[in-house]
Regions:
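Active-site entrance/lid segments in N-terminal catalytic domains of soluble metabolic enzymes
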Residues: 1-207, 235-240, 293
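Alpha/beta catalytic cores of nucleotide-metabolism and tRNA/nucleoside-modifying enzymes
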Residues: 1-23, 183-210, 214-406
Length: 406
């Protein structure tokens, strides 16, 4: 017989964080919002990129680390390429059959391999069985991340299999339609809190990653306050100037159209001038871009490598061309299924959409760091161990929600 849980369940929007009675932290500069990265031996924010091909590619991979965010190479890259980067110490996503191939192909790992088993339904028995085999064979030389789950009791099985990180959340992503397609979803705020309570009461070692429903800095902070060890972000990151998605623009002014193209790590951008007396053949159009050294000068360029663009130029372009968008799509969308060569007939549970290109990677990361520092100061938390899962959150009344969001 089916049951109904009548307890109210809350999303991030329903909750806010109550400050500490008294804070002895006198300045944001006095708190540490970072974790240690084994890959770079540097500090990182408690944030992973979603393994989305419209977010991460091989060209922006180290840019994420340089901005204190841990990237995960998505499954659209060739298996051999992912194995190559896996050996270099990068997080890489694999499907079930691919992980089985790794298990059958490697007697041992020369160093620590960071593997995300990237499937939609993290409650499958064969996922648990394969992860248990991997950890039994490779021990601590493999770090496993798996999911997604939306039932706190599943944590016990994950921990028993030796899985190191669990992605928590089903149907909450900005380009995910699992909830509307299947009806399977638990509001993310309550789910993260329930998983944290279950983890602490059972004394489990597994790390919780809040995955889905992140729309702003405060959502990241609330997820941590509720007990997530890390937060996974996809849609927001897809809107970064440096993200892997296509740059699309319909900006028109004074007879010119902003032309931006990004292919294989190279960006071509500038004003594509229409000349009435000349044929509109692309070969006869003049491409101009803002000079990378002086944004007040206009210089002819083409095929400008993304990594040489200064932060000043990137911010100038975002500010100047307000109709700039990035194309993003979920890894369960038709487009991603095509990239992954999924067999025809499988129902898509993701969508494609355009989102405004509003930030550079550095802008967002610095803003996120500052916001997290401020929240930790309000909550008298010197470090993330003091902050994660140790806060009091309050449920907003309907009237307050309307006031806050208006």
């Amino acid at each position: 017989m089916s049951t109904i849980n009548t307890a109210l369940q809350y999303s991030y929007d329903d909750l806010t964080i109550m400050p500490a009675v008294r804070s002895t932290v006198n300045s944001r500069k006095d708190v540490n919002p970072f974790k240690h990265s084994e890959k770079t031996n540097n500090e990182v924010l408690p944030i992973f990129t979603a393994p989305m091909s419209s977010v991460v590619d091989l060209y922006n991979l180290d840019m994420w680390y340089n901005n204190h965010i841990t990237p995960i190479i998505p499954r659209n890259f060739d298996y051999k390429i992912r194995i190559e980067y896996l050996k270099k110490g990068y997080w890489c996503a694999f499907g079930l059959s691919e992980l089985e191939d790794i298990y059958n192909s490697f007697d041992k790992f020369d160093n620590t391999y960071y593997i995300l088993l990237d499937i939609a339904n993290g409650h499958l028995s064969n996922l648990l069985q394969l992860c248990a085999k991997m950890k039994a064979k490779y021990k601590d030389s493999v770090k496993l991340m798996a999911g997604n789950i939306a039932n706190p009791e599943t944590l016990t099985m994950y921990d028993a299999c030796g899985i190191d990180y669990v992605r928590v959340g089903i149907g909450g992503g900005s380009v995910c339609i699992t909830s509307s397609n299947t009806g399977c979803h638990v509001p993310q705020g309550s789910l993260i809190h329930a998983c944290y309570e279950y983890k602490t009461s059972a004394h489990l070692d597994i790390k919780i990653i809040a995955d889905g429903g992140i729309r702003n800095y405060d959502d990241v902070i609330k997820a941590l306050a509720l007990g997530a060890d890390y937060v996974m972000v996809g849609g927001i990151f897809g809107g970064f100037f440096e993200s892997a998605g296509e740059i699309i623009n319909d900006y028109k002014q004074y007879g010119s159209i902003l032309y931006i193209d990004y292919v294989d790590g190279t960006i071509t951008f500038g004003l594509k001038y229409s000349v009435p007396e000349i044929s509109q053949d692309d070969n006869l159009l003049q491409y101009k871009v803002v000079d990378t050294k002086n944004i007040s000068e206009i210089t002819e360029y083409k095929d400008v490598p993304l990594h040489i663009l200064s932060e000043e130029v990137k911010r100038y372009l975002i500010k100047e061309y307000t109709n700039m968008h990035k194309g993003i799509y979920g890894m369960a969308s038709k487009k991603a299924q095509s990239e992954l060569k999924v067999k025809a007939g499988q129902t898509a549970e993701g969508i494609e959409k355009l989102i405004p290109c509003k930030y550079t990677m550095k802008q967002w990361s610095k803003n996120m760091e500052d916001c997290l520092r401020s929240a930790m100061t309000y909550c008298n938390a010197q470090n993330l161990n003091d902050f994660i899962g140790k806060q009091t959150l309050v449920v907003n009344s309907l009237g307050e929600q309307i006031a806050v969001n208006s």
